[in-house]
Amino acid sequence: MANGLKFSPRKTALALAVAVVCAWQSPVFAHGSEAHMVPLDKTLQEFGADVQWDDYAQMFTLIKDGAYVKVKPGAKTAIVNGKSLDLPVPVVMKEGKAWVSDTFINDVFQSGLDQTFQVEKRPHPLNSLSAAEISEAVTIVKAAPEFQPNTRFSEISLHEPDKAAVWAFALQGTPVDTPRTADVVMLDDKHVIEAVVDLQNKKILSWTPIKGAHGMVLLDDFVSVQNIINTSSEFAEVLKKHGITDPGKVVTTPLTVGFFDGKDGLQQDARLLKVVSYLDTGDGNYWAHPIENLVAVVDLEAKKIIKIEEGPVIPVPMEPRPYDGRDRNAPAVKPLEITEPEGKNYTITGDTIHWQNWDFHLRLNSRVGPILSTVTYNDNGTKRQVMYEGSLGGMIVPYGDPDVGWYFKAYLDSGDYGMGTLTSPIVRGKDAPSNAVLLDETIADYTGKPTTIPGAVAIFERYAGPEYKHLEMGKPNVSTERRELVVRWISTVGNYDYIFDWVFHDNGTIGIDAGATGIEAVKGVLAKTMHDPSAKEDTRYGTLIDHNIVGTTHQHIYNFRLDLDVDGENNTLVAMDPEVKPNTAGGPRTSTMQVNQYTIDSEQKAAQKFDPGTIRLLSNTSKENRMGNPVSYQIIPYAGGTHPAATGAKFAPDEWIYHRLSFMDKQLWVTRYHPTERYPEGKYPNRSAHDTGLGQYAKDDESLTNHDDVVWITTGTTHVARAEEWPIMPTEWAHALLKPWNFFDETPTLGEKKK
């Protein structure tokens, strides 16, 4: 994991007028001798800093790692993280170009003010595979006699060492002496192959063909599909029915076909994609121009269209709908600046992050995105276990329209496409605040080549309101601010962009926020307004959000895999249900409030709908706080959101999707820890006929009492479209929480008692 910052001129100002390529000798003096001047923009960009010029303030803003610098041309001082710093040589403007001393970087950025990044002395055993390790793994598998030349790679990731050994490293510093090992998932035409590779000894430990699996959709499949569509004379003829004579203006979206037990007429063992298309009209938003009721079924092995499915011809909506501001005058806003005058409150040592009392490891996986590991909380000098691993487990976006172009749409974004592979680089000041540190991440592409994603993850601290407050009459106010540390990651899957925040509170709470933004998948219809004759039928499965455009009703359902280890691995699922009970103690009251507490002892019983009026805890019954209560963490799958809550799958129980992906319908699942059980939708969900995920994991109904348990929470929203979300959707959130419950002895943010 490495930090990487990018050049981004401020929108309200003119871009830097400093496009020069050679150094300039200037009559500027430093410490009595002539200074050597170099171009500001080129020098700072090569250093990896973010450079902005504010034309109104006549000021440069320079951002690198934890340093936030403001400097005006000619000034003898710069403001670094809110503090004044003397400059031996000022910034000089000459002929509209900015120049700095060749010692400027050392003077400003290496002035000892920032200690965010620390050198990792002992590599964490869960560190992501390096670029060299990825290349080594590919070299080893390519040398295997079973390897075929046309094989592609869908995942190359760390094969995790033993969990107990990793915890021993995190808690006691005990070295993990097992060799670094890689899991390699390959696709040979339609055949999926798994290999485990010993990188240290350069040998293959296992080579396993996976029968009946279809594997992920890879990025080169998108290119193949576009070429197939563009060169198909059959498809070109069908396009003419829709008034389209140039197939080159058609943009394709390859989609998985789902499973309908043969009722869709598709051969189960073929590697197929369904393709819906849009017209590129030049407005920058082809999503606004769907070619409705037209679906091409593409065979990826044969590289041809095997079937075209059609419904009634609907004219392509042609009204321009750009969302990039080309036709708008956006109101200017005054700058909002966040400075950290004394540096950051967190440090990043290799891939391990320390903030306040929290320590955790962070890596990026090509399927599920960030994985947070060995999460601990320092409680008055004692490092306490909270969670071994937490990550997105999987997600699904199912649509409720039965028409020809929609009935199969149920996007398993991580399981079918790989959301880590589709990571969207974070833009400072827009996708994350200006004080964020951006981390680059390296994963493998489909050829096996290591690829670095710049700005893949953002880390930042933020003010989050009062942590606590009380004003007693006649006494001074007592209050303190709440701080949060946010780990942000964004993945763009087709039309939608998903923002995931892991939010650490200094009081021991962990928030998990999932936000959906981007562009709705819309349907072309005849109706322009709700007064048109076809409007009622056109909006049966959605909302008319523009002339001739319906936003279809669907769900965004997220599942998070949370291997909580509350003060150790032996945990128990406990229920607490507040109830009204008769008052038997006398007095005028007829009723009381009491809590019915009981243990949920098996996997089948643990799979539940979430009732926000109840409490579910993962408890360590062998550990107590000072009052004798077992230490616990509360599990809150849905802690609010900005769309209606997805309280279950909006499908009839006889639907195949309901049976294949049962994780959708219940918000709480708890299973025994097994290292191979990682995905709620199963490892290979593409065209799967049965539930190979959580439904299968819980089928044997293992005991959960005093065992190493894994919590899975399903959360999300049911998305009923509205006009305010078109042509681009404001971010809509779903929130989940993990809260300490008698884990501490008192309010944890009071601090340590004075000696």
Feature roles, as predicted:
Residues 2-11, 15-122:
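Primary recognition of N-terminal secretory signal peptides and signal-anchoring hydrophobic helices
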Residues 33, 93-95, 177, 268, ...:
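Surface-exposed coil/turn segments at beta-strand junctions on protein surfaces, enriched
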Residues 40, 50, 120-122, 136, ...:
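Interaction-mediating elements
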Residues 50-56, 69-79, 112-120, 148-149, ...:
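Extended intrinsically disordered, low-complexity coil regions enriched in Ser, Thr, Gly, Ala
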Residues 125-170, 218-262:
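Short, non-transmembrane alpha-helical segments in secretory-pathway proteins
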Residues 148-200, 246-300, 356, 487:
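Exposed beta-strand-loop-beta-strand "reactive/processing" segments of non-cytosolic proteins
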Residues 199-204, 208-217, 240-242, 280-370, ...:
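Extended effector regions of multi-domain proteins
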